Regions:
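ATP/Mg2+ or Mg2+-diphosphate-binding catalytic cores
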Residues: 13, 255-256, 284-326
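A cross-family kinase active-site recognition segment
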Residues: 2-3, 119-183, 202-204, 233
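Juxta-kinase regulatory segment immediately upstream of eukaryotic protein kinase catalytic domains
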Residues: 1-40
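Short acidic/glycine-enriched loop/turn segments that link adjacent beta-strands
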Residues: 47-50, 104-108
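Active-site activation/catalytic loop segments of kinase-like enzymes and analogous catalytic loops
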Residues: 238-268, 277-296
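Active-site acidic catalytic loop and adjacent metal/ATP-binding pocket
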Residues: 45-58, 65-66, 191-239
Length: 326
């Protein structure tokens, strides 16, 4: 493959319609909201879960965003975690307010305020990158030290991913298809780099831990919001922002200069930053050739391939990897 794949982030999920939710769930939501639901938009087709997610209009004039999932789906636990976490975030963290929750049968629903916004990074512009950077700086400051108790370490979240490059080298896992032709040559260095993770990917900051452009919203006033707070962990204060850099670089933003000037990263050792990017690249090398899980479209696997590609490209520049065979 000679170029990174294109991904349509407006079509990454296949979610149920409002009519597919059990009547008991819809009634429980109306009771929890204290208002009848008069209209529900078609479900959003972004994100990487198969849970219901759509804007709703209420008789009292409010607009809200409803997410609901049945027990057994990843989204069921994710929505519960978000409902637990968001009310504990400091006011400086700009996340949609949780309005209410509801349970019925084996379903859980969480309702948040509706933010009329757009996803940045399609592609990144300098203005949107500055907005996202500012949000990451403010959020990191507000969440250090973590105001939430009992969080797992970020390293624990990615512990198994650290093993992926070595597994590929050992023949225990296949190298995914359609990546840069030079990837096999740099796998030994990638495997070495991720071994720093136990000492690097720890810290006292509560991190979003899954910050991507599709987990950001820029509203009509230009304000940047952070959504989907179900992977919160303890880690270095810079990981959320650094996780945005490789795809932004791929789309024309000079992140190599930005990382030397930003207060989140200016004093962080190069190997620490590169280790984190290497771990995310390793994670993206898992399973991109398999069919997507239920509720996701094939765009999920192309997203993995795009992120593996761009994170490896970013490392290749930073570490002078041999991308041309001589």
């Amino acid at each position: 493959m000679s170029r990174a794949p294109d991904v349509d982030y407006s079509a990454t999920s296949a979610r149920p319609d409002w009519s597919a939710l059990p009547q008991a769930v819809r009634e429980a939501l109306a009771d929890a909201l204290g208002s009848r639901i008069t209209a529900v938009s078609p479900p959003v087709s972004t994100g990487f879960t198969g849970g219901f997610a759509a804007r709703a209009e209420l008789t009292d004039g409010r607009q809200v965003f409803i997410k609901a999932a049945q027990q057994g789906l990843h989204a069921y636990n994710a929505y519960q975690r978000e409902a637990e976490v968001v009310p504990q975030l400091p006011s400086a963290v700009r996340a949609p307010v949780i309005v209410t929750t509801a349970r019925a049968d084996d379903w859980f629903a969480v309702v948040s305020e509706w933010i009329d916004g757009r996803m940045p990074g399609t592609p990144w512009t300098a203005e949107d990158f500055e907005r996202a950077t500012a949000v990451c700086e403010v959020t990191a400051e507000a969440l250090r030290p973590s105001p939430l108790e009992g969080l797992d370490r970020f390293f624990d979240l990615v512990r198994d991913d650290v093993k992926v490059p070595a597994q590929i080298l050992a023949g225990e896992r296949q190298l995914p298809a359609r990546l840069q032709e030079w990837v096999p040559r740099v796998l030994p260095e990638l495997a070495d780099l991720v071994t720093l993770a136990p000492e690097v990917l720890v810290g006292d900051t509560a991190a979003h831990s899954d910050l991507r452009p599709d987990n950001l919203l820029i509203d009509n006033a230009g304000v940047c919001w952070t959504i989907d707070w179900n992977w919160l962990t303890l880690g270095p204060r810079w990981i959320d922002w650094v996780g945005l850099l490789p795809i932004a670089q791929h789309q024309g933003i000079d992140t190599f200069t930005a990382i030397t000037r930003n207060p989140l990263t200016a004093d962080v050792p190069k190997d620490h930053l590169d280790c984190f990017v290497a771990v995310i690249a390793a994670y993206m090398l898992k399973n991109p050739d398999l069919p997507p899980p239920p509720g996701c479209t094939p765009a999920l696997r192309e997203h993995q391939r795009l992120y593996a590609w761009t994170f490896l490209d970013w490392l290749a520049v930073r570490r002078n990897w041999p991308t041309v065979e001589v």
